[in-house]
């Protein structure tokens, strides 16, 4: 117990000290606070994008899902997340250009600059904030899991403590501090996750022995195949979900705006798929192997499988050290989410005449409390919370892509697209049985299938409304992708 306190306490203190050091050249203006002066080069952009995207969902959600589903979850996450580099590249360069053109730091600000529509800006910002709250709740939920595994106390204590810590250093240093702590926490998380995998595999007698044990049991043999888990439609839907949802994460969009150049975005997109495999392989293998030791965990309880396995094989000292990987992953995402979502509220939703410093700080604190409350009182699993947020994000993609690439998009088309797409997402969440007879019921593993009808509705709303208001003015949907340096 005492050694665990030393490890976690030392890590928390180190992050606060590092954040204070990292703010040494922080300016007071929004561009410095939210975009680090648009100075992120290729290597730093890659590290901060990866550390921000690989969150509690990566460590605990994917290990819990692989416990229930098996190794078929590995290509779903590793290939799917890596594949999103395509959309990051196609959209990222145009986002950066429009961001500079309009002085925009968020997607709704860019849409406002392109369409001149305050209604479109407010609609998009409101939905993005609402979508981020469930995803924000993943991080304190996972912090509670780590705290419980280390100290045996209730989950909510760990959730509260980590939320306080992250809010403290986010308010201290803005994006520059967040990016610099991302680099440290990303390296810590990746290194310790691989150490944890080596410990679990060694305890199981080697990877071949573990896989043989899984395949030889009637209760676990299904963990090595995709039968009953991922049909072709579910697999394709999940790939589409990652492709369109991830660039819409406010914290990832913010980093594309903060890139130093188009070449930096190209280098990041080129290397990102390799980093995705390195990040997802350890937790998914640990979750699958964990079924041998703990065969009867329920859906929410399976999110605990990674810390449980690590503590079993590593003991208090080494196990506690490896569990810091989970803390590093969730903290490197939570700080970015708070900062990016705070910029949505202060720059898109609040009155520009409000006192800037008070608004920035109070909004970040309020968002952290909302996420904390949802994490403590909701009984949804980490995977459930993540899929809900992803589905809401994906609907934004057509409007953002169209607004970035065309100068004459009507703001009413953006509003229609968002409302139509989100209506389908809401239907999938609250009335999945409505999809019976004409589509796949979006429940459990089939939740991602809702992305196809929701994107279709969003595209239809965008195109039909745009056609009605703008085609008489000679608008054309001609879409061009210009060549750019990748390396």
Question: For the regions a protein language model found, what residue spans apply to each?
Answer:
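Membrane-embedded helix-loop-helix hairpins and adjacent transmembrane boundary segments
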Residues: 1-487
């Amino acid at each position: 117990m005492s050694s665990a306190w030393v490890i976690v306490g030392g890590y928390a203190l180190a992050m606060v000290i590092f954040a204070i050091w990292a703010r040494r050249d922080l300016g007071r203006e929004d561009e410095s606070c939210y975009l680090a002066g648009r100075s992120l080069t290729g290597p730093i952009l890659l590290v901060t994008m990866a550390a921000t995207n690989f969150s509690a969902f990566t460590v605990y959600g994917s290990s819990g899902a692989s416990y229930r589903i098996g190794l078929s979850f590995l290509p779903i996450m590793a290939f799917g997340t890596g594949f999103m580099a395509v959309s990051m590249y196609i959209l990222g360069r145009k986002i950066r250009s429009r961001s500079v053109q309009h002085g925009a730091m968020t997607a709704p600000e860019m849409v406002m600059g392109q369409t001149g529509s305050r209604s479109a800006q407010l609609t998009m910002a409101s939905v993005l904030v609402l979508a981020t709250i469930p995803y924000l709740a993943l991080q304190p939920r996972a912090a509670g899991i780590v705290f419980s595994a280390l100290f045996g106390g209730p989950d909510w204590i760990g959730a509260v403590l980590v939320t306080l810590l992250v809010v403290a250093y986010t308010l201290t240093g803005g994006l520059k501090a967040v990016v610099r702590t991302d680099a440290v926490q990303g390296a810590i998380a990746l290194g310790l996750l691989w150490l944890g995998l080596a410990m679990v595999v060694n305890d199981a007698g080697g990877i071949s022995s573990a896989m043989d044990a899984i395949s030889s049991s009637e209760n676990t043999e299904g963990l090595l195949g995709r039968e009953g888990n991922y049909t072709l439609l579910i697999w394709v839907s999940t790939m589409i979900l990652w492709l369109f949802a991830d660039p819409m994460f406010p914290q990832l969009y913010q980093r594309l705006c903060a890139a130093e150049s188009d070449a930096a975005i190209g280098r990041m997109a080129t290397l990102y798929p390799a980093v995705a495999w390195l990040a997802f392989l350890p937790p998914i293998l640990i979750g699958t192997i964990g079924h041998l030791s703990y065969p009867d965990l329920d859906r929410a309880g399976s999110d605990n499988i990674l810390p449980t396995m690590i503590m079993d094989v590593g003991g208090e000292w080494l196990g506690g050290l490896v569990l810091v990987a989970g803390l590093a992953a969730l903290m490197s995402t939570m700080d970015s989410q708070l900062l990016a979502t705070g910029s949505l509220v202060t720059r898109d939703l609040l009155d520009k005449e409000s006192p800037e410093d008070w608004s920035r700080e109070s909004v970040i604190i309020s968002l952290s409390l909302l996420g904390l409350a949802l994490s403590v009182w909701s009984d949804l699993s980490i995977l459930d919370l993540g899929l809900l947020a992803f589905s809401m994000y994906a609907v934004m993609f057509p409007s953002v892509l169209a607004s970035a690439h065309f100068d004459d998009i009507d703001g009413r088309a953006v509003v229609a697209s968002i409302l139509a797409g989100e209506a389908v997402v809401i239907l999938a969440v609250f009335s999945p049985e409505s999809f019976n007879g004409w589509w796949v019921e979006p429940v459990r593993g089939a939740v991602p299938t809702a992305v196809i009808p929701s994107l279709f509705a969003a595209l239809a709303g965008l195109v039909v409304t745009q056609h009605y208001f703008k085609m008489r003015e000679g608008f054309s949907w001609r879409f061009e992708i210009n060549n750019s340096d990748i390396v």
